[in-house]
Amino acid sequence: MKDAILWNKLPGGKVECIACSRRCKIPDGSKGFCFVRQNAGGRLVLANYATLEAIQIDPIEKKPFNHYMPGSYVLGVGTSSCNWGCLFCQNHNISKERDIKGKEVMPEELVALAKKYKTGSIAYTYNEPTIFIEYALDVAELAHKHGLKNLFVTNGYMTKEAVHEMKGLIDAAVVDWKGNGEQKFSNKYEVVVSNEPIKEALVELKRSGIHVEMTDLIVPGVGDSLEACNSLTRWAYDALGPDVPLQFTSFHPDYKMMDYPDTPYETLKAHYDIAKKNGLNYVYIGNAPGNPYESTYCPGCGSLVIGRYGHYLTEWKLDREKRCVECGTLIPIVGGPPKKLSYRDIELVY
């Protein structure tokens, strides 16, 4: 347990948490929607500080980042619970956990693990990192001192105040839309009343100098509106620019939506086509290994510049300045090239 940041005192012993956009108003002795941010005698505390339910080494493309340190490996960590209520959550074993469980790993221990396993970064992932932001930022500060980068894998439902705290400590964030951000879908399947805070957070993240990428989980039949895709990608072009990476990912049955099918490839390709038509240069299709759109192509000449199969790199056709070797177009990639293009077994640390 640790004193939280990002909260206000309210009358009657209540506190308002301002880490995520739910802005829960919490009576003394109670917890917010996330079940880990708690009012303890009129002060907000993080009840699961440094208590991790998942610690694992992954390819960075699994997060998924396609334009940040491609080909590298990341130490991913997550805790209990979440600030959303997704009915399809693939990590529901930890995100729906209401008891605080896991292994205590203090910031210095986590950084030591990252160095031991020779990862270039630490990702706060598996559940929503905004709810354990105090721990993430404590780790991030120490990680920077050891030359490690810090990554948020987030639903983006964070406040501007939270982004302000992240500035200078979090290096990159991938924001995971679901169902094209269509509001009826979010209301019913995510327990989210408005997606506007996500858009505000994305703009604020970019303004703060944090590298931003996006994913969009396409759920067949209920979260695959092409009209909503058109709206979201037009907004992304206008607000974030043509070079923001966007990956459409395939749904698979999980948690309370086991009776829904996998997303047809044709549906993903239709979304891809709309995003490209709306001017986005770097659009991907994920969770469909072997498809041509998991690779990066030069917007100048169309040549393949980074080849991928699943989460692994197969080709690198950029020069030292990250320019396409065919036409010289500068490709917005942070980091790389990898030392070698090879498969490394995913290691379960805890």
Predicted regions and their residues:
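Conserved Radical SAM active-site core
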Residues: 39-172, 341-350
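Short, conserved glycine- and acidic-residue-centered signature motifs
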Residues: 70, 103, 194, 264, ...
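Iron-sulfur (Fe-S) cluster-binding segments and ferredoxin-like electron-carrier domains
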Residues: 23-47, 91-100, 305-311, 331-337
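Ferredoxin-type iron-sulfur electron-transfer modules and their immediate structural context
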Residues: 1-61
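Conserved AdoMet/S-adenosylmethionine-binding subsite of the radical SAM
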Residues: 107-266, 274
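Auxiliary Fe-S-binding modules of radical SAM enzymes
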Residues: 1-28, 222-350
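Cys/His/Pro-rich metal-binding microdomains
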Residues: 18-21, 35, 80-83, 87-90, ...
